[in-house]
Amino acid sequence: MVTPFPEVSEWLCIGQIVGAHGLRGEVKVKPFSDFPERFTVPGCRWLRSPRQPQPYAVTLLRGRFLPRAEQFVVTFAEISDRTAAEALKGAEILVPASDRPPLAANEYHLMDLIGLAVYHQGERVGEVVGLVNAGNDLLEVQLLDPAPKAPQSVYIPFVPAIVPVVDLAARRIEIDPPLGLLP
């Protein structure tokens, strides 16, 4: 049976290939997902790269986590040597958005936070433009009106004490940052 081809708008990027590992076609993956089984459980995944923007199916055979590097090493059936693995550097690993795991109350898919307006004391101060996993997740917020010589963006720890309100329906979050976090 052929795997149905989801619409491009339905993709969820779960990681990026950052290089080859070894001589047998394994690749190193920087994960963007908090669900390790996406990189260890065999099955269909999709790749998209700048050289091939149309996603194509690959078969994940196995994967393992490298804790020191905070990366996964994965094996795809279609990649059998280092040269082929190196050619995938920069490619995104995708799954259909419909494959998102269900979440508990007050949990969010971090990618859903990108583009949300950020408010502090009722005033819009910026927009979430990125995410960084640094122990705790950090929201990269591009400031609307930064002071001269001030940073254009700041990193806000995504913890309930600092981000008490997330309203996905209204496309906004409210922050209560400690003194000095905002310029």
Swiss-Prot record:
One term of GO molecular function: ribosome binding
Gene Ontology CC: cytoplasm; ribosome
Function: An accessory protein needed during the final step in the assembly of 30S ribosomal subunit, possibly for assembly of the head region. Essential for efficient processing of 16S rRNA. May be needed both before and after RbfA during the maturation of 16S rRNA. It has affinity for free ribosomal 30S subunits but not for 70S ribosomes.
Annotated family: Belongs to the RimM family.
Domain PRC barrel per the UniProt entry, residue ranges: 105-181
UniProt KW keywords: Chaperone, Cytoplasm, Ribosome biogenesis, rRNA processing
Subunit structure: Binds ribosomal protein uS19.
Single GO BP term: ribosomal small subunit biogenesis
Domains (record comment): The PRC barrel domain binds ribosomal protein uS19.
Protein name: Ribosome maturation factor RimM
Localization: Cytoplasm
Upper classification of the organism: Bacteria, Bacillati, Cyanobacteriota, Cyanophyceae, Acaryochloridales
Primary localisation category: cytoplasm
